[in-house]
Amino acid sequence: MSRISISEIYKDDIIVNTPITIFGWVRSRRSSKSGFSFITVYDGSCLNSVQVVADKTLSNYYKDILHLTIGCSVTITGILILSIGDKQKYEIKATKFQVLGWIKNPDTYPISAKKHSLEYLREVAHLRSRTNLIGVIVRIRHHIFQSLHKFLNKQGYYWIPTPIITGLNTEGTGEMFRVSTMDMRNIPKKINGSVDFKKDFFGKESFLTVSGQLNLEAYACSLSKVYTFGPTFRAENSNTSRHLAEFWMLEIESSFCNLDEILIFSEDMLKYICKSLLKYCINDIKFLKNYIDNDIINRLKKFLSVNFIRINYKDAIDILLNSKKKFDNVVSFGVDLNAEHERFLVEKHFKAPVVIINYPKELKAFYMRLNDDKKTVAAMDLLVPGIGELIGGSQREERISVLDLRLSELGLRKEDYWWYRDLRRYGTVHHSGFGMGFERLISYITGISNIRDIIPFPRTVKNADF
């Protein structure tokens, strides 16, 4: 007899009154004095549980079944029947019931029947996936991941596995994790006292990647449309609900594509994801509606129906200055927008997703294309309500002379970027791309405000447990 998942039962894939076998964990047990027990079992394949009816005719009824507690792992063989109760559509009349794993001490089991706060669940991250909420988040995360791959494949994009270890600083910042095999108690030094990285594993200073963009551009210049999707690392000392040291990033690069075209593409991609979730994950979405965000369905439907607002950075600054609102962070031209500025624009002023374009070059990375005014770059940040920046991208600088100038202005050695510069020397093309924080997208969709509740094992400042 084949193993059946609970999701298959609720998809009406299984014929009623046929024998089936399921595996799962106990969510609850009710037992009557007349010799019947009603055990709720889940297996994580969907939000639903299934009720199992076990009676005293089972050989291990008194020995095992009457001692079941939440969390016990079980396998049940029985007959799938239509439930006579109104709380569930199906139930299983058990003919064989086996306990695979007991909860050693139910009184100290961290995931008990009571409701737990998200803060508490972070402390038991290895067990929190056993709760309904985290299960919902994981299934939604999985569906978004699969939907992105499906969408990009339909659009003719190829997935490229970019390296996690790099010798380049893509963003030009110092917030990188260093990779080394050197003995920290006896670090080799040069005569001048600096670290001799030639003695290290890679023979040079190396880091965990902050972005796969530069490598991705190399393949965009031959395959036209490419993307990468994987973990990214930032040693940013920010202990907030919006920051992780390790997170997942989707990065897109498209040759023969300008800023306007990549903007349209990003909007189409996000709307495809939301539409797919409302179609295929509606039960999980409804759970979030009941427990996290009462407006989630209307919010996602509105997201599908509105056009994204597009404004210049200068106009965004003018709106903020004219709002007369007192911000914690000063607003002026040439200052990077803070989260409070971004959220004011999308939540108070426009009440819709906003794309800000054409930032001052001083605020952006060396690889962004310099505009004709020589003061701004063809950059874009896509902002959404509740989150702020979701996507950051630009048209890339394809002119080697301008690229070299920007590297020099930012104090970066062009020799370190020799292969990246080669892309401009040999058959250069105009191209554009963007990066999207995967956890931020999930946060926006689910309404879960703390990003640490969205990734299975969060890595943050002073925290690398589990």
Curated annotation (Swiss-Prot):
Enzyme Commission code(s) on record: 6.1.1.22
Pfam families, sorted: tRNA-synt_2, tRNA_anti-codon
Swiss-Prot/TrEMBL keywords: Aminoacyl-tRNA synthetase, ATP-binding, Cytoplasm, Ligase, Nucleotide-binding, Protein biosynthesis
Subcellular location: Cytoplasm
Main location: cytoplasm
GO cellular component: cytoplasm
Class in the EC hierarchy, top level: ligase
Family listed: Belongs to the class-II aminoacyl-tRNA synthetase family.
Quaternary structure and partners: Homodimer.
Identification of the protein by name: Asparagine--tRNA ligase
Source organism: Buchnera aphidicola subsp. Schizaphis graminum (strain Sg)
